[in-house]
Amino acid sequence: MARQVICWCFTLNNPLSPLSLHELMKYLVYQREQGEAGNIHFQGYIEMKKRTSLAGMKKLIPGAHFEKRRGTQGEARAYAMKEDTRLEGPWEYGEFIPTIEDKLREVMNDMKITGKRPIEYIEECCNTYDKSASTLREFRGELKKKKAIISWELQRKPWMDEVDTLLQERDGRRIIWVYGPQGGEGKTSYAKHLVKTRDAFYSTGGKTADIAFAWDHQELVLFDFPRSFEEYVNYGVIEQLKNGIIQSGKYQSVIKYSDYVEVIVFANFTPRSGMFSDDRIVYVYA
């Protein structure tokens, strides 16, 4: 057991002297018990001030068998105080401070309320963090995304009405290219509006593998190219998404399909000549 944790359950067979709260411990509870086979032992639960290794715990209570806590904080404490096998005790030292349950759903709910980062649960919910750190980071990202999206506001421009009208037609064979050479026409603000109101997929471009991996079958795909990206536009990935079929080779090779995809490009430049058939491009001038 190489991992360092805060919360430990222990059994000490044939104890010779009582235990006390070590300066490294935050909380200790134990009692003297007799097992089914008649062996006398201490059964206890410890919460350390800092994450501690198994070797470190064995130095504090030599001869004890330790396991990291697997259930909740309350369950571990209750097990160390159970009546059916008790001979003496229980004895408690330090302060028992109930925290949120060390379960993924409870931690996620707490993150919603407190806004804590996943790393902040590494001590009080060590089991959940050890098992689900990546899930917690992804969940926090979604919380941040929702908070940001709610704050987005749109100052409408006439050209946006033209795009709205085009989107009502549902034509997945075309690419809508919103062209505004000066900048400041509201292209990015409108792209954010579509993310907020239509759950659109948003990208500023990049490698096909990265974009294909990130795309989660959204029907509306937005490419919002900065001016400096003109020479690096990945026209191939735009075409593939427009066709509703794209191969994602990142981490695990998979082909993604969709029966309808609408692609909108926002740029300060027009597409390079010959990249798309003329009948596939619909220009909107911002």
Curated annotation (Swiss-Prot):
ATP binds at residues 180-188. Its main location: host cell. It is found in: Host nucleus. A motif (RCR-2) lies at residues 41-43. A motif (Nuclear localization signal) lies at residues 50-70, 96-102. Disulfide bonds: none annotated. GO terms for cellular component: host cell nucleus. Divalent metal cations, possibly Mg(2+) or Mn(2+). Its cofactor is Mg(2+); Mn(2+). A divalent metal cation binds at residues 33, 41, 84. One of its GO terms (biological process) is DNA replication. A motif (RCR-1) lies at residues 9-12. Keywords: ATP-binding, Covalent protein-DNA linkage, DNA replication, DNA-binding, Endonuclease, Helicase, Host nucleus, Hydrolase, Metal-binding, Multifunctional enzyme, Nuclease, Nucleotide-binding, Nucleotidyltransferase, Transferase. Residues 2-96 form the CRESS-DNA virus Rep endonuclease domain. InterPro entries: CRESS_DNA_REP, Helicase_SF3_ssDNA/RNA_vir. GO terms for molecular function: ATP binding; ATP hydrolysis activity; DNA binding; endonuclease activity; metal ion binding; nucleotidyltransferase activity; RNA binding; RNA helicase activity. It catalyses: ATP + H2O = ADP + phosphate + H(+). Essential for the replication of all genomic viral ssDNA (trans-replication). The closed circular ssDNA genome is first converted to a superhelical dsDNA. Rep binds a specific hairpin at the genome origin of replication. Introduces an endonucleolytic nick within the conserved sequence 5'-A[GT]TATTAC-3' in the intergenic region of the genome, thereby initiating the rolling circle replication (RCR). Following cleavage, binds covalently to the 5'-phosphate of DNA as a tyrosyl ester. The cleavage gives rise to a free 3'-OH that serves as a primer for the cellular DNA polymerase. Homooligomer (Potential). Rep binds to repeated DNA motifs (iterons). There are 3 rolling circle replication (RCR) motifs. RCR-2 is probably involved in metal coordination. RCR-3 is required for phosphodiester bond cleavage for initiation of RCR. This is Master replication protein. It comes from Milk vetch dwarf virus (isolate N).
